[in-house]
C-alpha cells in the first residue's frame, strides 16, 4: 500500500484545537517482505497549521481487504515521544472503492491513550474512511 498527497483536515480532527482546519500533507508505504512477521515502510503526516509533524517507521500489522487497507504502528510526533497510529485508506480505483481515494489517520499518545488527531473522531476503528484526498493525490493498494 502506497500513497502521497494532501487532504483537508476537518473540524474536530485536531483535538488540541478542534476548530482548526486546513491542509494536511501525507506520504506512506507499507508492505510485508517475504517471511516477515511485521510490515515495513514509513508514514509521514504533517498538519502545518497545527504545528504537527508525525513520522513512523514501526508497524504492527497491515490488512488489505478489497479496496481497503489498514495498518497500525507507532512513531514520533514533532520528533519525540511515543505515539500509536492507525491509518485506513480506500483505493477509489479498485472494485468497491467508489471512484474516490479516501483517508483516515488516527494518532494517540501511547502511554495515556489520549487522542491527538483523528479525522473521523468518534468513529469505530473498523469504519471505512470518509475524507477524500485532494486533487493530484494518490492511494494505491496492491496485494
Set out the residue ranges of the language-model regions.
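Mature soluble binding/inhibitory domains
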Residues: 1-92, 96-143
